[in-house]
């Protein structure tokens, strides 16, 4: 199990690349399956405010070490990224996943807020990734 900080925001991103061509019929056209880069850049812009509120920020994806490192570099993100290609967080955090027609598994876009090591808020299947960071900042301010 991956250890998370006691106070943190964890968001999962699908970043499917070419596997997006093989989405199952029920997910084709679903909101929120694209926009990983925009979401990460928005979180980078909000990172200082999230830290000032006493929370760490962690992005979780399943791209492999090299893909995760390259994606983090490409977005200019300074917060932590976790490569969870073995889906070690799926069961303990009750994270939703999906599988594409080419047999690859991904996390749905979700954001969880933890305080004192306990999940206190969850946002599932985020439809507007570029708005997620601002929505989370509002939620953190209202805790």
Model feature map: region roles:
Residues 1-143:
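Chalcogenol-based redox active-site neighborhoods
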């Amino acid at each position: 199990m991956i250890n998370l900080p006691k106070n943190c925001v964890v968001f999962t991103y699908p970043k499917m690349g070419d596997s997006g061509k093989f989405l199952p019929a029920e997910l084709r056209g679903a909101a929120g399956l694209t926009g990983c880069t925009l979401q990460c850049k928005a979180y980078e812009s909000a990172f200082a405010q999230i830290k000032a509120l006493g929370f760490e920020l962690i992005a979780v994806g399943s791209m492999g070490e090299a893909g995760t490192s390259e994606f983090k570099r490409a977005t200019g993100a300074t917060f932590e990224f976790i490569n969870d290609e073995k889906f070690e967080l799926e069961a303990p955090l009750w994270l939703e996943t999906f599988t594409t027609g080419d047999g690859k598994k991904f996390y749905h876009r979700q954001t969880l807020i933890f305080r004192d090591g306990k999940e206190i808020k969850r946002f599932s299947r985020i439809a507007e990734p570029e708005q997620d960071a601002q929505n989370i900042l509002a939620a953190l301010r209202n805790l």
